[in-house]
């Protein structure tokens, strides 16, 4: 966390009664994390920089490129771990420390936060934008994209819609259109999909990055074509991006 190893973790000092904002950013190249704070719950207030109705959870999953702002109520004095564990398991998690100012000499609580395994996990369906969302309606254009790759026949190629960048055809759009993107994940790995230059509506929230679960997971989003240019749309797993899982969104 913040460039520090668990053996010498970053520490954040708080005082009892404070409301503490934590800005969680996953800049990783290939790791999705489950995040929890020992002895405390988290109230999510923003995702990808956009405000949402507050929702209180015990843990959240943050994909590569995603961002969350959460507020922690400092009402449980002590020295607590803030842990980011991989979605695959709990071995060697990243760690920081939430230390109350009056807890000098107190030892860090042992073990992983209970919230990593129990309690309420944040789901995209929990997120409700406080901003006005683009009205729902029939899209002017729809792209159906199968996310696949890593197969035995060609393990070093990852594709969107059966095509690998840079040889993939652009996704052509026209200014003023409402565009819908439907993604189905044919692979065994999670894909955090990121669109440059736009925020999109994913359910009832505005985001610019959305996770597509493995093993036939599906995700859809809609956006208004209102920022002319040539924009990158890609998986934020950098290994998949490098191996072709990207397309250009091109205004025509």
Segments the model singles out, each with a brief description of its role:
Residues 7-8, 128-131, 167:
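Glycine-rich, charged/polar anion/phosphate-binding loops
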Residues 72, 82-83, 96-98, 123, ...:
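Short beta-strand element of the conserved SAM-dependent methyltransferase core
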Residues 1-121, 205-212:
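Histidine- and aromatic-rich segments of cupredoxin/plastocyanin-like copper-binding domains
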Residues 44-58, 138-252:
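Active-site pocket scaffolds in enzymes
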Residues 67, 71-78, 129, 223-230:
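Eukaryote-biased detector of low-complexity, proline/serine/threonine-rich segments
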Residues 113-142, 147-149, 153:
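Compositionally biased low-complexity segments at domain edges in trafficked proteins
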């Amino acid at each position: 966390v913040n460039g520090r190893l668990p053996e010498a973790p970053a520490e954040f000092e708080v005082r009892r009664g404070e409301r503490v904002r934590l800005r969680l950013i996953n800049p990783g190249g290939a790791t999705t994390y489950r995040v929890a704070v020992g002895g405390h719950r988290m109230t999510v207030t923003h995702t990808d920089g956009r405000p949402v109705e507050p929702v209180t959870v015990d843990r959240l999953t943050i994909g590569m490129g995603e961002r969350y702002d959460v507020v922690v109520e400092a009402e449980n004095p002590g020295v607590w771990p803030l842990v980011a564990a991989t979605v695959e398991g709990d071995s060697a998690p990243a760690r920081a420390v939430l230390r109350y100012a009056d807890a000098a000499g107190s030892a860090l609580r042992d073990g992983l936060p209970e919230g990593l395994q129990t309690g309420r996990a944040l789901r995209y369906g929990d997120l409700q934008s406080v901003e006005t969302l683009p009205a729902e309606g029939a899209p002017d254009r729809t792209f159906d994209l199968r996310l696949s790759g890593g197969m035995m026949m060609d393990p070093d190629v990852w594709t969107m819609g059966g095509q690998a960048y840079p040889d993939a055809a652009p996704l052509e759009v026209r200014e003023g259109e409402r565009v819908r993107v439907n993604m189905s994940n044919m692979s065994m790995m999670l894909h955090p999909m990121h669109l440059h230059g736009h925020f999109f509506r994913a359910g009832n929230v505005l985001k610019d990055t959305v996770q597509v679960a493995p093993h036939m997971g599906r995700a859809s989003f809609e956006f208004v074509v209102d920022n002319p240019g040539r924009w990158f749309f890609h998986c934020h797993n950098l290994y998949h991006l490098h191996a072709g899982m990207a397309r250009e969104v091109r205004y025509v």
